[in-house]
């Protein structure tokens, strides 16, 4: 059986073998008598005290392939465990940073879209567009023009041909017959009278058009009479 103390290749071989060991006194507390290599035997192996647990080669592969077999101990185990935990934390931190970057980019795009919507200039014609349907951009909510059917227009023209001014009772009757409101009937007759006045003024400018002036005077008297009658009934 060869050993470091019986190998002739060693230049520092001595008979006692104590000089190979560190230069420490035998009675020193730092010197471990169990690790004295001059004696061998089963009794010494049984009484030998290990300061660190024994690890199998499998543990060496799992927890640290870069470590030598002499570097393993309780501290090495905890260091490997800390390295695994730090790697997991770094990967989780990287994923969190990527998700935060995506959220920030989506919020930035959303903010840019809102700024573009807010920077659109609204013109007056855009405010009046589709205001009767409540889809206009501005606060100017104006009523749209009432579109009358051909039947309604024909009946109103017949009534205007006989009576240019209507009493309130007659307005209610026509409104019920034509499925219109009293206000719509009143507005239609006002617009129709304005149109009739324009036509009469054009005819009065022509020679022999004195009758139009008399008709306009009579119209003014009838309009005043209609207004006074409507106020008295209301």
Swiss-Prot record:
<dbReference type="InterPro" id="IPR020479">
    <property type="entry name" value="HD_metazoa"/>
</dbReference>
<dbReference type="GO" id="GO:0009952">
    <property type="term" value="P:anterior/posterior pattern specification"/>
</dbReference>
<keyword id="KW-0804">Transcription</keyword>
<feature type="compositionally biased region" description="Acidic residues">
    <location>
        <begin position="225"/>
        <end position="234"/>
    </location>
</feature>
<keyword id="KW-0371">Homeobox</keyword>
<dbReference type="GO" id="GO:0000978">
    <property type="term" value="F:RNA polymerase II cis-regulatory region sequence-specific DNA binding"/>
</dbReference>
<dbReference type="GO" id="GO:0005634">
    <property type="term" value="C:nucleus"/>
</dbReference>
<protein>
    <recommendedName>
        <fullName>Homeobox protein Hox-C6</fullName>
    </recommendedName>
</protein>
<feature type="DNA-binding region" description="Homeobox">
    <location>
        <begin position="141"/>
        <end position="200"/>
    </location>
</feature>
<keyword id="KW-0805">Transcription regulation</keyword>
<dbReference type="InterPro" id="IPR001827">
    <property type="entry name" value="Homeobox_Antennapedia_CS"/>
</dbReference>
<dbReference type="GO" id="GO:0000981">
    <property type="term" value="F:DNA-binding transcription factor activity, RNA polymerase II-specific"/>
</dbReference>
<comment type="function">
    <text>Sequence-specific transcription factor which is part of a developmental regulatory system that provides cells with specific positional identities on the anterior-posterior axis.</text>
</comment>
<keyword id="KW-0217">Developmental protein</keyword>
<dbReference type="Pfam" id="PF00046">
    <property type="entry name" value="Homeodomain"/>
</dbReference>
<feature type="region of interest" description="Disordered">
    <location>
        <begin position="88"/>
        <end position="116"/>
    </location>
</feature>
<dbReference type="InterPro" id="IPR050296">
    <property type="entry name" value="Antp_homeobox"/>
</dbReference>
<dbReference type="GO" id="GO:0006357">
    <property type="term" value="P:regulation of transcription by RNA polymerase II"/>
</dbReference>
<dbReference type="InterPro" id="IPR009057">
    <property type="entry name" value="Homeodomain-like_sf"/>
</dbReference>
<feature type="short sequence motif" description="Antp-type hexapeptide">
    <location>
        <begin position="122"/>
        <end position="127"/>
    </location>
</feature>
<dbReference type="InterPro" id="IPR001356">
    <property type="entry name" value="HD"/>
</dbReference>
<comment type="similarity">
    <text>Belongs to the Antp homeobox family.</text>
</comment>
<dbReference type="InterPro" id="IPR017970">
    <property type="entry name" value="Homeobox_CS"/>
</dbReference>
<keyword id="KW-0539">Nucleus</keyword>
<keyword id="KW-0238">DNA-binding</keyword>
<feature type="region of interest" description="Disordered">
    <location>
        <begin position="199"/>
        <end position="234"/>
    </location>
</feature>
């Amino acid at each position: 059986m060869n050993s470091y103390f019986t190998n002739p290749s060693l230049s520092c071989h001595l008979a006692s073998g104590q000089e190979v060991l560190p230069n420490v006194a035998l009675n020193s507390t730092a010197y471990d008598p169990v690790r004295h290599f001059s004696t061998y035997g089963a009794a010494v192996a049984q009484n030998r005290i290990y300061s660190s647990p024994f690890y199998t080669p499998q543990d060496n592969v799992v927890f640290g392939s870069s470590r030598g077999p002499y570097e393993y101990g309780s501290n090495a185990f905890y260091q490997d465990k800390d390295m695994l935990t730090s790697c997991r934390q770094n990967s989780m931190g990287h994923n969190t940073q990527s998700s935060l970057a995506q959220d920030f980019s989506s919020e930035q795009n959303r903010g840019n879209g809102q700024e573009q919507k807010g920077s659109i200039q609204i013109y007056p014609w855009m405010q009046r567009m589709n205001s009767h349907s409540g889809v206009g951009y501005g606060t100017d909510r104006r009523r749209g023009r009432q579109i009358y059917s051909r039947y309604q227009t024909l009946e109103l023209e017949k009534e205007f041909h006989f009576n240019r001014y209507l009493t309130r009772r007659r307005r209610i009757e026509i409104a019920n017959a034509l499925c219109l409101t009293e206000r719509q009937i009143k507005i239609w007759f006002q617009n129709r009278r304005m149109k009739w006045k324009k036509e009469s003024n054009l005819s009065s400018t022509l020679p022999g058009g004195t009758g139009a002036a008399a008709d306009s005077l009579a119209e003014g008297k009838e309009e005043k009479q209609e207004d006074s009658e409507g106020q008295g009934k209301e």
